[in-house]
């Protein structure tokens, strides 16, 4: 009958007893494995082999990365077990499979920024100071790799000129990118630009855009604040090339469609608003759930107006960006 799903879930071994761990962080502090790229900060800083995945994680319980833990790999170390006063470390844990019956399933696979290897003209692979908007978000976050201080990844200096580039891979019918608008880029770029101007008034900010799309409630007013109150320079035009100079700066070569001319800007950082695409887990999950998808691998709702969060498959519900680009 509808809503009677038997689901098998693989629960990965944490190697830490959740009922005993207090989240004190002493094990992380003492762990000798220090040079593991931090996935949550997109590899811009490092974590330890035992760690709490991110700030404000729920539950606030440490986990051990089996691929990098010396004790789990070769039986040599055990520092975290020695310093844990709660006795929460358990190297004997194994992955377990849980089988339960559920009345409904919610697909919430989210999204990923598009890979930028096809867009070499923006210099992402050539310079550490060309970053994606998500990387820039982490750089400005208090829990990020620089504790919220905006610094250039290449040399740790403060950037005095930042160029934001819109629609990198969005609205692209060439086959390299995505044909659809990613919807959220115009607003988060305006937010980032205002954050920079508010915290660092000496920093010059430029935004290159095709169109500014701000259809939501108070969205256009938000964008106008960036221009009128914060002095963000919006330039309607396309960026043709970004390349590093010998002195460490970046040259942005672009067109200004309003002035009808080619321009060059010397920048300290370039931020790319990368297109949103479905998470790679979406298609395999849809196959398991027998749920329908569109040509872009987003889940399809039963009816856009009458049943906007239901899949055509009874008992399967859709949440967030699994249906398409969305803001919070």
What spans do the regions from the language model cover?
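Residues forming the flavin
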Residues: 1-328
């Amino acid at each position: 009958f509808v809503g009677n799903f038997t689901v098998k879930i693989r629960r990965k071994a944490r190697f830490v007893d959740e009922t005993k761990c207090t989240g004190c962080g002493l094990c992380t502090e003492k762990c000798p494995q220090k040079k593991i790229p931090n996935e949550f900060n997109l590899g811009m800083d490092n974590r330890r082999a035992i760690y709490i995945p991110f700030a404000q994680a729920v539950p606030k319980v440490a986990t051990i990365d089996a691929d990098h833990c010396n004790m789990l790999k070769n039986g040599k170390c055990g520092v975290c077990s020695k310093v844990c006063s709660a006795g929460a470390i358990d190297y004997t844990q194994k992955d377990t499979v849980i089988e339960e019956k559920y009345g409904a399933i919610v697909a919430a696979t989210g999204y990923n920024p598009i890979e930028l290897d096809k867009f070499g003209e923006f210099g992402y692979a050539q310079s550490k100071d060309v970053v994606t908007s998500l990387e820039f978000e982490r750089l400005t976050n208090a829990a990020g790799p620089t504790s919220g201080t905006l610094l250039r990844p290449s040399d740790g200096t403060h950037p005095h000129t930042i160029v934001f580039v819109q629609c990198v891979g969005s609205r692209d019918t060439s086959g390299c990118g995505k044909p659809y608008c990613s919807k959220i880029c115009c607003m988060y770029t305006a937010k980032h630009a205002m954050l920079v101007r508010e915290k660092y008034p000496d920093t010059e900010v430029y935004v290159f855009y095709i169109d500014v799309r701000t259809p939501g409630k108070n969205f256009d007013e938000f964008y106008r604040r960036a221009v009128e109150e914060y002095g963000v320079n919006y330039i309607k035009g396309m960026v043709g090339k970004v390349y590093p100079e010998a002195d460490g700066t970046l040259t942005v070569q672009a067109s200004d469609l309003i002035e009808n001319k080619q321009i060059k800007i010397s920048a300290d950082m370039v931020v790319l608003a990368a297109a949103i695409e479905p998470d790679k887990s979406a298609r395999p999950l849809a196959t398991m759930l027998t749920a329908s998808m569109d040509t872009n691998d987003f889940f399809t709702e039963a009816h856009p107006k009458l049943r906007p969060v239901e899949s055509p498959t009874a008992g399967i519900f859709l949440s967030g960006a699994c249906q398409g680009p969305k803001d919070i």
